[in-house]
């Protein structure tokens, strides 16, 4: 089999397309169960603001919060594989939990209220029920409609679980992320409900549709961010300044991955375990 080489290297990365044994991720040395969360925080002795990541997935938002200076003490998600990944990479509590369950919400808020002041509750409740992409497929055929109903309708009210944690824990601020479609015709009632409920809980609320490319990320998909700051506890939220006004000037996908060698699939007997990295080709990398 002939494999084209990258113009930057004569040594393309070859991937043997065979699924190996499942990788078992070891927990972070400083991970703890939900029962021990208050003691973990007490022993933490950190000056960093404490944050909670709801619907944390594998930990993308947790990583961003960590880089922003927060101490993420708790990440919650319903998927065991996501929590295993989160628990591997982050200290504190990575808790598998069904946030639609009142019992589980009570358990989480009870522990958090023993942890001292929480500065931020952040997270992105599942967006599939509000995504236009799902709605287009919803009308394709009966099988897709059934799949949509079974997988997504039960997730539609999880934003309420997010706000329940905010109301019970009273963090200084919250940050909710979702698709922009939640503020569009058809779902505006939910969007207005989020704003109204947060304001009744004592938060000043601001929402903005953010285009990632404007902030230096090579991605076109916009996301809606709803930021709330507790009146009397902290100053109003300030949105970040945009880096790019025009898409043509923004970073592109090629700017992000052009330093990577070509990835070749299929069965290759003489495949390589490693690849020599040529180094970054631009400032983004």
Language-model-detected regions and their locations in the chain:
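S-adenosyl-L-methionine-dependent DNA methyltransferase catalytic core
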Residues: 1-70, 197-200, 223-285
